Amino acid sequence: MNLLVFFVYLXVCVIGSHSIXGSQQLSTKKCGGAICAMACTYGFVLDKDGCPICKCRDAPCPLVKCLPCKYGYVIDDNGCQTCECKPLDCGLVCLIYCPYGNIPDERGCPTCFCRPRPCKELECEKKCRNNVLDEIGCPTCKCKECLEPKKVGPCRALIPRYFYDVWSGKCKKFYWGGCQANGNNFKRKSQCCKRCKS
């Protein structure tokens, strides 16, 4: 046998193990006598038995620079990292219906605990058509229409009406033109006071 050919390709492959009476015994199989004289930078492709065949392996995964992913990256069919982020895998989802949503755990996955009602039930003395919202979006007992400016409108009728003056905190008389009113337009002073005065 030519020494060069012998040096280029000779392999013994371990193809598996099995247990007999509690002890582990290795089964070995000599890989076929394929002779390959080509030099492969990344080694040879292995067959189904784990023995090299006369075909060079592709280059390892390309070096990729990706933005950070909170849950890691998707791995492609070749075992290489992609720049696609893995989605959050929450596993089983709770089947309890929560009208205001579920409280998330530390990973952001929904738990079986419901969020509380975000806004308190209002107990206002006055009824508003549109309530003023607070900083977290919950309605207050203030009426939006009371915050609107006095609006006479473009028409020329002189209809006595009342509006709530935010600056003075009082309901004042004005003459409405008869068209294009806003919400701060009341027929009687008592209506204005009931709706807008605290």
Curated annotation (Swiss-Prot):
Keyword hit for Iron: no
Subcellular location: Secreted
Residue ranges of every copy of the BPTI/Kunitz inhibitor domain listed in the record: 146-196
GO cellular component: extracellular space
UniProt keyword Secreted present: yes
Signal peptide: 1-19
InterPro entries membership: Antistasin-like, Hirudin/antistatin, Kunitz_BPTI, Kunitz_BPTI_sf, Prtase_inh_Kunz-CS, TFPI/VKTCI-like
Top-rank taxon: Eukaryota
Record's keyword terms, sorted: Disulfide bond, Protease inhibitor, Repeat, Secreted, Serine protease inhibitor, Signal
GO molecular function terms attached to this record: serine-type endopeptidase inhibitor activity
Pfam families in alphabetical order: Antistasin (PF02822), Kunitz_BPTI (PF00014)
Tissue: Nacreous layer of shell (at protein level).
Listed PANTHER family: BPTI_KUNITZ INHIBITOR DOMAIN-CONTAINING PROTEIN (PTHR10083:SF374), KUNITZ-TYPE PROTEASE INHIBITOR-RELATED (PTHR10083)
Identification of the protein by name: BPTI/Kunitz domain-containing protein 4
Organism: Margaritifera margaritifera (Freshwater pearl mussel)
